[in-house]
Each structure stands twice: as C-alpha cells, then as structure tokens.
UniProtKB/Swiss-Prot annotation:
Its EC number is 3.1.3.16. The keyword Transcription does not apply. Its cofactor is Mn(2+). The gene is Ppx3. This is Serine/threonine-protein phosphatase PP-X homolog 3. Mn(2+) 1 binds at D53, H55, D81. It holds the Pfam family Metallophos. Mn(2+) 2 binds at D81, N113, H163, H237. It catalyses: O-phospho-L-seryl-[protein] + H2O = L-seryl-[protein] + phosphate; O-phospho-L-threonyl-[protein] + H2O = L-threonyl-[protein] + phosphate. It is an enzyme of class 3 (hydrolase). Belongs to the PPP phosphatase family. PP-4 (PP-X) subfamily. InterPro entries: Calcineurin-like_PHP_ApaH (IPR004843), Metallo-depent_PP-like (IPR029052), PPA2-like (IPR047129), Ser/Thr-sp_prot-phosphatase (IPR006186). Binds 2 manganese ions per subunit. One of its GO terms (molecular function) is metal ion binding.
Length: 305
C-alpha cells in the first residue's frame, strides 16, 4: 500500500466517505504489522493529547481535530471505544486506523470495552458494517484488529493511561505486560478489568453494577500509583457531563470526548493536552453542527452509559 493510496483513503474518510472492502482488508493487514510490534503497555512521549471515548460520532471527531490540531501535527493517544452507538463507527475507526498506518509514531490507539466482537454485535458496529458493505467481511477485518490493540499506555513513565481502570489482579505494570492480549475481551480477569472498571468514592474494591470489572477507591489508586511510580491515571469509559473529572487528590482523571453523547445527553466533551513537562491543559468542545439535525438515538439504559 503506497503513501499516496493511504493519503487518498485518509482524504476520503475525512469526508465521511467509505473506502472499498478490498482497501479495508489491505489497511487492516498493514495495521496488524504495526500493532503487533507494540507493547501491552505502550510507551508514549510527551507532548501528547489524550482523547476519551468517541463512539462513532464522526463529525465530533472532526471537531476534536479542529480543537486539538490535525494528526500528525499533534501527537494523539486515544483511549478506546471508537465504535458503537454513534452513526459513523465505520468511518471513525477506519480513519483512526488509516492515520495509525500513515503516522505510526504520532497516534496511539488502545483498546476499550467496545473493541469486542460480542459488544459490537449488540451496540451498532456489526449492523453498520453489514448495512454499509452488504457483508460481514469489514466487521471481521476490524474486529480482528481489535485483538492487536494495546491494553494501556504510559506517558514519560509518569502517566498511566487505560480505557476503564484498575484490577485486583494487577499490582504492577509488569502484570499487564504478562497478559496475552491477542484475544476477544474476556468476561473477567485482568484484561477485562482494565477495560470495564470504574473509580468510585469507596474504600478498596467493590463489584461493578456493569456486570464486568470492578469499582475501585482512592486508596487503591494511591497504592497503584505509589508502587508504579505513577503521578496520574488517565482513563475514559464514563460519561462526564463537564467533559472531564478529576478525583482522588488529582491522582486520577476521566476524559470524555463524545459531546452530546448518543446525540441526546447534552454533555460537553474534552481532550487533555500535555506539554513536554507534562503540564496539563483541558480543552472543552461541543457537538459538531452536522449533528444538529440527527434524530436522537433510542434511549439506552443508564446502566450501560
């Protein structure tokens, strides 16, 4: 696949136009070659801009790039949940993947709980692939790539980034490095917890109302950060009406990057910019104008938000 082919595909995808099934297959083959070399805990250099859930809200991703700068000018780290719920999961994921193949050192993609065959069959990506391509091949190519995505990232050895949260099975980063990630997201265990867990104002660990992962308290965060010489955990996975939420004496932050989530929640979104000294700047943005006339998605039980 030549650079000019890739550049044409990126331009098409930026216009929210689909590339062919054959092009998707070739793109995924190339992406796999790049992702297989990345670590379970991928090292990322600052400056970098961290983005939370996107959920197929393509025009809001375009808004994000307006606010944060284009790739490769800006170095990006996306914390997963690229697909499901929004109307343009296909274009969203394929654009991010094409940028990854074109600029592998300027964009890092880690896996969220929605980067899963099972979840995408329920929440929209599967149906969207079938509707737009008339077969399940594109869904298969993409979900195969999900298995190669890193589970976490660490910025300058100081900021730990993950989609969901911590796990009682994980004490150190080496515990994450020991996971065989090339599989469907399991229903329980360390890999599952990284993608499903949530922080809460509790002590220790508690069962999660989501039915997967755990709730974990500030003492757990304190302990993990101390053991691993980490200053901050940065995660996504939970809708935050104000775009981001800092917890536990600034030891953890949730970043949410899907404005007016599901085209009905009325929330703003944010991205977190870190300069070379790891100084933080949150940038808030609202839903793109293109979404204004969209019909609201049917209500989702709050349990799953």
């Amino acid at each position: 696949m030549s650079q000019s082919d890739l550049d044409r595909q990126i331009a098409q995808l930026r216009n929210c136009e689909n590339i062919t099934e054959g092009e998707v297959k070739a793109l995924c083959t190339k992406a796999r070659e790049i992702l297989v070399e990345e670590s379970n805990v991928q090292r990322v250099d600052a400056p970098v801009t961290i983005c939370g859930d996107i959920h197929g809200q393509f025009f809001d991703l375009m808004e994000l790039f307006k606010v944060g700068g284009d790739c490769p000018d800006t170095n990006y780290l996306f914390l997963g949940d690229f697909v499901d719920r929004g109307f343009n999961s296909v274009e969203t994921f394929l654009l991010l993947l094409a940028l990854k193949v074109r600029y592998p050192d300027r964009i890092t993609l880690i896996r969220g709980n929605h980067e899963s065959r099972q979840i995408t069959q329920v929440y929209g990506f599967y149906d969207e692939c079938l509707r737009k391509y008339g077969s399940l091949n594109v869904w298969r190519y993409c979900t195969d790539i999900f298995d190669y995505l890193s589970l976490a990232a660490v910025i300058e050895e100081k900021i730990f980034c993950v989609h969901g949260g911590l796990s009682p099975s994980i004490k150190t980063m080496d515990d994450i490095r020991a996971i065989d990630r090339k599989q469907e997201v399991p229903h329980d265990g360390a890999m599952c917890d990284l993608m499903w867990s949530d922080p809460d104002e509790i002590e220790g660990w508690n069962l999660s109302p989501r039915g997967a992962g755990y709730l974990f308290g500030g003492d757990v965060v304190d302990d993990f950060n101390r053991k691993n010489n980490i200053e901050l955990i940065c995660r996504a996975h939970q809708l935050v009406m104000e775009g981001y939420r800092v917890m536990f004496n600034e030891q953890l932050v949730t970043v949410w990057s899907a404005p007016n989530y599901c085209y009905r929640c009325g929330n703003v979104a944010s991205i977190l910019e870190l300069d070379e000294n790891l100084t933080k700047q949150y940038k808030i943005f609202e839903a793109a104008q293109e979404n204004k006339g969209l019909p609201a998605k049917k209500p989702i039980p709050d349990y799953f938000l």
